[in-house]
Amino acid sequence: MMKKIDVKILDPRVGKEFPLPTYATSGSAGLDLRACLDDAVELAPGDTTLVPTGLAIHIADPSLAAMMLPRSGLGHKHGIVLGNLVGLIDSDYQGQLMISVWNRGQDSFTIQPGERIAQMIFVPVVQAEFNLVEDFDATDRGEGGFGHSGRQ
């Protein structure tokens, strides 16, 4: 299913020097987001920084949200993940997409201008209304939590 999402280019290099976000393959779930930087940024181990994308989106449809996720290769090979682990973009947000980048690795990492640094997916949203109750209907699991079902 394809859905039209309004995008505003905030940095004139986007669409020229830096490509617009695209799906890498026909089966890709995530759009690659690029670091819209003037100069390379070096991240020491344990450091975080906010990286601009040069883009703003307006989803408008309250039944959708966007999520920013780390790119698997950067996380696995270099320890580069999102500082907030997952970025959530609400349907009514219209500001620049910023990527919180965290170097959880052992070595410094340099983010280059235009580098693909995160990915964004669109997900359905259900807004819940709480129904106050005294007790829940009984289930087999009950209050069994962490480790409840074992490892095997």
Curated annotation (Swiss-Prot):
* Cofactor(s), by name: Mg(2+)
Q: Which gene encodes it?
A: dut
Classify the source by domain of life. Answer: Bacteria
Provide the catalytic activity annotation. dUTP + H2O = dUMP + diphosphate + H(+)
The UniProt entry, under InterPro entries, shows: dUTPase (IPR008181), dUTPase-like (IPR029054), dUTPase-like_sf (IPR036157), dUTPase_trimeric (IPR033704)
Q: Which family does it belong to?
A: Belongs to the dUTPase family.
The yes or no answer to whether the keyword Magnesium is present is: yes
Q: What is the lineage of its organism?
A: Bacteria, Pseudomonadati, Pseudomonadota, Gammaproteobacteria, Enterobacterales
Annotated binding of substrate, by residue: R71, S72, G73, N84, L88, I89, D90, M98
Name assigned to this protein: Deoxyuridine 5'-triphosphate nucleotidohydrolase
Q: Show the Gene3D superfamilies listed in the entry.
A: 2.70.40.10
**GO: which molecular function terms?**
dUTP diphosphatase activity; magnesium ion binding
